[in-house]
Amino acid sequence: MNRLTIIIAAICCTMLAYAQPPQGFGGPRVEPQYKNVNYAGDELEAHQMDIYLPQGNQERYKVVVAIYGSAWFANNMKGMAYMSIGKPLTDAGFAVVCINHRSSGDARFPAQIHDVKAAIRYLRANADRYRLDTSFIGITGFSSGGHLSALAGVTNGMKSRTVGATTVDLEGAVSGHPDESSRVDAVVDWFGPVDMARMENCETVKDGNSPEAALMGGAPADMPEMVSLISPITYVTKDCPRFLVIHGDADNVVPHCQSAYFAEELEKAGCLEEFITVPGGQHGPVTFNEGTFKRMVDFFLKESAEKAQSPNKKLTLKQADGKYVVEYQGKTVLRIEADGYGLGKTFAQRQELTFVRHLHEDYTMLSGKRLHASNEANEYAVAVDDRTRLVWRLYNDGVAFRYELTGMNGETLPEERTAYLIPEGKNRWVQRWTEPYEAFFPHATTGESRDHRWGYPALIEAQEGVFALLSEADINRRQSASCLRNDGDVERYRVCPDKNDLKMTDNWHSPWRMAIVGTLANVVESTLVTDLSEPCRLTDTSWIEPGVVSWIYWAHNHGSNDYNIIRQYVDMAVEMKLPYVLIDAEWDGMKDGKTIEDAISYAKSRGVKPMIWYNSSVGWINGAPGPKFRLNKPEDREREFAWCEKLGVAGVKIDFFSGDNQMNMDYYIDLMESTARHHLLVNFHGATIPRGWQRTYPHMLTMEAVYGAEWYNNVPTFTNRAASHNTTLPFTRNVIGPMDYTPCAFSDSQHPHITTHAHELALTVLFESGLQHLADRPESFLAQPQEVKDFLGQLPTVWDETRYVSGYPGRSAVIARRSGNTWYVAGINGMDEEQVLDADLRAIIPTFRTARLFLDGKKWEIRTATKLPTTVKCRPRGGFVYVVER
């Protein structure tokens, strides 16, 4: 305990002796306007704060929270935070909020970060009372206060974190404001301990007599998982706010290397403003000086400056030359024309963007790339004319905008005046428009084409390593979906909604036009499409069960009218433990005296849930397979789906739609609402792309809208282009929603495949779909090694999280998805020559118990591993899968 006493004495004496800013730096000392405010609604001194306002009569002040250092041993030193680092900030015009928090003697970690986040939530909830502008909340602290400030920043939006068998609740339940956000917008870390695993001589944990041991409640060497969870460096991601890190190189309490390690990780994530090393700076003395205080103030002034920006401030929006310019970390990504519909009177001068609100909404999906998602954005608005309001949302991973019209009086919408300006020479992967969205995403550097019509999504590499994925979201009734056209000007991609002759009355808004912006990791991991879409409209979702499907059509185009073939696929589902079988087209003409009722009865008797196919009867009708004309009229649709429900049908596949006009969008919604009433899962085939319905109607588990494995039945070109095409889909089509590619072809259809077995297996993980239809025939699947059959029988189609590992469109793709405590990692080579793929998972899976590797061999190489290789040598058009148990 002597060592702890020495540390505390050193910190306190140092702060008191040297913390007061130099005379003349600012004006006279400011007393707190609000003293001993309790932010938790209890009587604890540890839950008090002082609020200092600048001198003056400004209506509101932007906020900086300041936290004292005490090796986490003190619960009542909020005044020291102001004495040390607060005054320069009030002099600069900030409201400074100095908070107490529970000490390590009061409670173990994570109680201290719970207190910090509770204080921030309290400030947002009571901003009016204290004249605070909480559109900006910065945070700063020194020593242990630097640790808590850094931790508050790097855990923005995180509810909890698990390392190994240990889970930490990061938000806590202190205070009565659970609906408020605890995010911070910028961080200044003064010599805080940030990597508890390297506190002793920059290499190892300190002994059990250290302050961090008291904070954790045990010797760090005995608690490696908690050491990781208590360390801010563990949480650094691309979504962190901007950081300024300051540390003296003569600090004998917290080693300078702590901040060096931290700054390195922040730099990699693109979150570091600057790392300042103060020559001769100690744990306070010399490090605190007029120059470093000014750097802190300038940083907070810069970060709080009025501008349209994302919550993490990496993405900004400004107006220039009549366009809206989207920038990512200072680099121009998109220039957008957004001029409405020309319905109202325009203004003499272009109107300015104004801040509307900060939006923060957590929600849960039933399928998709991430179960728990957060819809967090800053919303701005601008008047286009006297009847049209343009609403912008700036997210950490993208932008979205829509038009809101008022006073519609029986008018039809004129042409929309929206365009994306994409210079020639930029890398792009865009499919030519087709009605069912079934085309390749070829690499190009030009917008030239035969008909200059393009389908969503469209991926653009705007700057080296910085991408924009264009699409749209939240299609509702009275709306059409759109495509892109660049006829007339090859660099100007106009947004062109499909035909909409509906006469509008009252108020109306467009769908969200959206762009995911950032690195390829931002693109792959984004949930922007569902963030923008309406919440789930179903009151009961307990019947919705995603899963893997035994599918007849790929090997037997007319097999669903053959009862014996259906039995084979049901039996395969039983053998491989697949929950579903899909009986495809032509079941209404069953041969051999059997009926669809017989097939459904057989599937149910074997414990397999049947799904059946329908023709939508709005697209291909003449000469098309049936059943047809059973869903178009409301009364027919209800009768048919009631019959399905009575028979025990689990879901329906509805095929052959026609276009994206308002009538068809309404038809999709009619189908989803009717199937929900009868507890039927939905797969839309020959259809439009996902635009967020997977959130609003979560029983809609997949959509085709992809040039998938079905095309091995149709054209020889798919054989040679499939591998490269497959590596574009994780960065384009599958980003926006579930994709019914129908993967896993080990044998051949009408045209052969030349991808390897491991490549095909990897597609089942690489491609996300709530219903994953397996393409191949029973004899092919049943001939595979038992490990492969077990893998497919246990394959999740619901993912807790998805992480980009490596890859580039057309070359390779490596993605990791987690289901519970199991990570599935899949990679494919899209090239015709051998490649070494980056599969470094150390940051994603730092520890694990067991791993099974599926690699390319003569057909297979399957083995267990105690260590995961960081690279994989992949055969031409090859692949791999890891199944890693934590």
Task: Name these PLM-found stretches.
Residues 23-31, 42, 161-174, 198-235:
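Mobile cap/lid helix-loop segments that gate and shape the active-site cleft of serine hydrolases
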Residues 57-61, 69-108, 147, 159:
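Short substrate-entry loop that stabilizes the transition state in hydrolases
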Residues 118-202:
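Primarily recognizes the serine-hydrolase "nucleophile elbow" in alpha/beta-hydrolase
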Residues 239, 244-247, 251:
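Short beta-strand/loop motif that positions the catalytic acidic residue
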Residues 311-529:
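N-terminal accessory beta-strand-rich subdomains and adjacent acidic, glycine-rich linkers
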Residues 586-756:
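Aromatic- and carboxylate-enriched substrate-binding clefts and catalytic-loop regions
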Residues 808-845, 880-883:
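Carbohydrate-binding surface patches
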